[in-house]
Design a protein with these regions (language model features):
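Short, small-residue-biased leader/transition segments that mark boundaries at the very start
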Residues: 1-5
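Glycine-rich phosphate-binding loop of ATP-dependent small-molecule kinases
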Residues: 6-227
């Protein structure tokens, strides 16, 4: 009978989703597509920081103090900002959280805060892409030295190799996209963030999708999971 009632109210089911995956796996793109499809907000920690700082909120002022010194915003403050964002009207049917948690302590703190509020995460979607693919994807990016336009040597090449289509200036490989930099970021990810996969698997909310296929195919696989 309980299942029957749940099915009847399927339309109103609240969907609280966390996106997992290595940097460059495409989780941000998929988060935006999920948000559009299910009419729930795509929430990233960067956006929350910027909005609170811009609006001069108490939490925003505290976060700005750390950021101005080039320090990481402490987990506790980040979590306060996130939980505050969840109270907004547009989150009443759920949200897609992207970029948090990144560590087990963050995941445990989020879990505790949600439980205290009588809430829980419904899905943790892991976009799986091997390191080799990510290094190739990211080290293929090129940026224009003048106008900042971005391209990719394989997926979005310019008409003339190494020259910006828009302004005709030279393209460069940014330091952030150099293979060794990308691999270093992936090493940090495997050490800090990979354990989250087991954390959410143990909670029975993990869903894994192959992120090596076409972007639309990745999204279709996610839609199948979410229903």
């Amino acid at each position: 009978r309980q299942m029957c009632i749940r099915d009847r109210f399927r339309e109103a089911v609240i969907m609280k989703i966390i996106m997992l995956g290595a940097p460059g796996a495409g989780k941000g793109t998929q988060a935006k597509k999920i948000a559009d499809r299910y009419n729930i907000p795509h929430i990233s920690t960067g956006d929350i920081f910027r909005a609170n700082i811009k609006n001069g909120t108490e939490l925003g002022k505290k976060a700005k103090e750390y950021m101005d010194k080039g320090l990481l915003v402490p987990d506790e403050l980040t979590l306060d900002l996130i939980m505050d964002r969840f109270k907004a009207e547009d989150c009443k049917n759920g949200y897609v959280l992207d970029g948090f948690p990144r560590t087990i302590p963050q995941a445990e703190a989020l879990d505790e805060a949600l439980t205290s509020a009588g809430e829980k995460i419904d899905y943790a979607i892991n976009v799986e892409v091997p390191d080799e693919n990510i290094v190739n994807r990211m080290s293929g990016r090129r940026a224009c030295v003048s106008c900042g336009s971005t391209y990719h040597v394989v997926y979005a090449p310019t008409k003339v190799d190494g020259i910006c289509d828009r302004c005709g200036k030279e393209l460069i490989l940014r330091d952030d996209d150099k293979p060794e930099t990308v691999q270093n970021r992936l090493n940090v990810y495997h050490k800090q963030t990979q354990p989250l996969i087991d954390f959410y698997k143990n909670k029975g909310v993990l869903a894994e999708v192959d992120g090596t296929v076409d972007m639309e195919d990745v999204f279709n696989a996610i839609v199948k999971i979410l229903g």
